[in-house]
Amino acid sequence: MQWLAFVAPRWRCVCDQELSAQTGHVTDDVGVSTPAKEGIMQGNGARCDVGFPPCKDNKCYCCIGGRTHARYSTLAECSHACF
């Protein structure tokens, strides 16, 4: 998994406390790379990754390279919005 750090885009979810508390959804911006955990869509390179700040506890999914760049509380929500 070490090689992912070199080929994966460098994204980071940014937490908006108010939105996070209400809906579990916030926007992201460029940040540090972390390993992908789940939800890779082969065709367009979009994926839902776990482990981005403030998601280090693996309780949210960030859409990377898809239709949206946001944070979701479940993989299903992320996949639906991202792909």
Curated annotation (Swiss-Prot):
Signal peptide extent: 1-22
Highest rank taxon of the organism: Eukaryota
Pfam families: Meg
Tissue: Expressed in endosperm, anther and pollen.
Keyword field: Disulfide bond, Signal
Cross-referenced InterPro entries: Meg
Disulfide bonds: 60-82
Family classification: Belongs to the MEG family.
Name assigned to this protein: Protein MATERNALLY EXPRESSED GENE 3
Protein's organism: Zea mays
